[in-house]
A protein has these predicted regions:
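Positively charged n-region of N-terminal signal peptides that target proteins for export
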Residues: 1-4
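Short alpha-helical "patches" and their helix-cap loops
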Residues: 7, 102-105, 474-475
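Bacterial N-terminal signal peptides
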Residues: 7-17
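Residues that line or immediately flank small-molecule/substrate-binding pockets and catalytic motifs
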Residues: 8, 131, 169
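Boundary at the C-terminal end of the N-terminal hydrophobic targeting segment
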Residues: 18-22
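Mobile, glycine-rich extracellular loop/lid and propeptide segments
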Residues: 24-42, 89-96, 101-139, 157
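A post-motif C-terminal structural segment
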Residues: 25-26, 35-41, 45-87, 134-475
Length: 475
């Protein structure tokens, strides 16, 4: 027994010594919202399939040398939401679903690894592909009993002492009270420079003391909840890779010696809530492109940089295979638009075309945007499903499709379901699951992430590696 305890003690000393020798100065904490193991596998298998091979086309982050599996349950539910999951990943504490940075009593605030990094003298950035006040980023700076308290969360962002934020926009920037300034003006009063789009950022960041990078005003006028899906992107749209470049540029300017950043790929989750496979795989690939930007930084500072990417939970219960032993992932290339954006397109076409908005026209449009009748051959039943959905749409009988982040037409929903069916992809839920999520890590101290771990261990391990001060009860 004494020998066992001695061995354990020596192991702890060895690990602590190894971590001290490899303390990272630059920490990249990526979170793929909703990204379970199968989402990653789907993206890599898709890459191989479109090149005509069976297997995977390796992405950058799944090729990192250190890997772990993560439990994601919250304090209140076997299946976590993004708020409780984000709180665990940010603060090392379990809480109830919907809670942002508070304990299960709903009032006791808990600090995050980003706060600990700031206390250690690091420059700190929080970035996302969705709104800056959404659940995952909010968990790193806010303390609210419910994730939908966007106005209050936004005010906590402005009041934080962090250096850089990036995302689509604030969801509720308007004044809460008469005589109060909006959040943009409040942020400017606190020393933030606000840039709309990457070009504005590039012009402004060198002279800025603190910054908030948002997408361009044109996109925010259409949809300020997120930047566009990679599948729907147009030239000039803000990308997660842009956001990562901006994060590095600003934080390195702010403190060349030490920085911490959390960067969320938020729309993997949104695509999975919609059970929309084509944008989902491209969001994972898009997240990889952002990680690759950080990886290039790591290559310049390999002994001083830690990169890890994990997830708050799995979304959609996706399966690669829906009967039999074949996959047809190249079918996903037939879809040129997210089902969410196609709903918008149908509304605009119907309004503009009037009586010329006919089934014959829409059938040709579906061929262009989903490959139906060309790369995807429709069965008679599928053709009828689409035609019936069109009839319901123009007659006002369309019940549509509702998920957490989208309200779609029945026609758009039917189209994406046909694509998934042809790709042999299955979905079990419009919500989250309790599936394991991965951690992939590289760099200084990355070997600390291995085996099966709880989500609360991740921020604590980052803090130990980087030498950030943690609350006593977490040590």
């Amino acid at each position: 027994m004494k020998r066992t305890l001695l061995s354990l003690a020596l192991g702890v000393v060895f690990c602590a010594s190894a971590w001290a020798q490899n303390a990272p100065k630059y920490v990249f904490y990526f979170i793929g919202d909703g990204m379970g193991v199968n989402q990653v596998n789907a993206a890599e298998t898709f890459g191989a399939a479109i090149e005509g091979t069976i297997g995977i086309k390796p992405l950058t982050f799944p090729s990192f040398p250190h890997v772990a599996l993560v439990n994601t349950q919250s304090a209140s539910h076997g299946i976590t939401d993004s708020a409780a999951g984000g709180t665990a990943l940010a603060t090392g504490r379990k809480t109830y679903n919907n809670a942002i940075g508070v304990l299960t009593d709903s009032i006791t605030p808990v600090t995050s690894v980003a706060v600990w990094a700031k206390e250690a003298g690091a420059a700190v950035g929080i970035a996302t592909s969705v709104s800056v006040d959404h659940a995952t980023p909010a968990c790193f700076y806010a303390h609210q009993k419910h994730r939908k308290m966007y106005a209050e969360i936004g005010r906590e962002l402005v009041a934080s002492n962090f250096d850089f934020f990036a995302g689509s926009d604030f969801l509720k920037p308007a004044p809460l009270h008469e005589g109060e300034a909006n959040l943009y003006d409040q942020a400017r009063a606190k020393g933030f420079t606000i840039a709309n789009g990457y070009k504005e950022f590039a012009k402004q960041y060198r002279k800025a003391d603190r910054m908030i990078l948002l997408q361009n005003k044109e996109n925010n006028a259409r949809d300020n909840a997120s930047i566009p899906y990679a599948l729907d992107r147009k030239k000039g749209d803000l990308t997660l890779a842009d956001i990562t470049r901006a994060t590095i540029a600003f934080l390195q300017k702010k403190n060349p010696e030490k920085f911490f950043c959390m960067i969320e790929a938020g729309k993997i989750d949104w695509a999975c809530h919609n059970n929309d496979a084509a944008p989902m795989v491209r969001e994972v690939i898009d997240a990889d492109e952002a990680v690759r930007v950080a990886y290039e930084f790591y290559r310049q500072h390999p002994e001083e940089t830690l990169i890890l990417i994990t997830a708050d939970h799995e979304t959609g219960g996706i399966t690669l295979g829906s009967g039999g032993y074949s996959l047809n992932l190249p079918a996903l290339t037939s879809q040129k638009i997210s089902s969410y954006l196609y709903t918008t397109r149908l509304k605009e076409l119907s309004k503009r075309m009037g009586k010329k908005f006919t089934w014959d026209f829409v059938r040709r449009d579906l061929q262009e945007y989903f490959g139906f009748g060309k790369s995807i051959k429709l069965t008679a039943e599928e053709e009828k499903t689409l035609h019936d959905a069109f009839d319901n749409l123009i007659s006002g009988k369309d019940k549509g499709f509702q998920s957490l982040y989208a309200s779609e037409s029945g026609l758009s929903s039917a189209a994406k379901q046909i694509v998934s069916k042809n790709a042999h992809i299955g979905w079990t839920t419009l919500g989250h699951t309790d599936g394991y999520v991965p951690v992939f890590a590289i760099g200084a101290g990355a070997e600390a992430f291995h085996g099966r771990i709880d989500n609360t261990e991740i921020p604590k391990t980052i803090a130990r590696l980087a030498g950030y001060p943690m609350p006593e009860d977490l040590k």
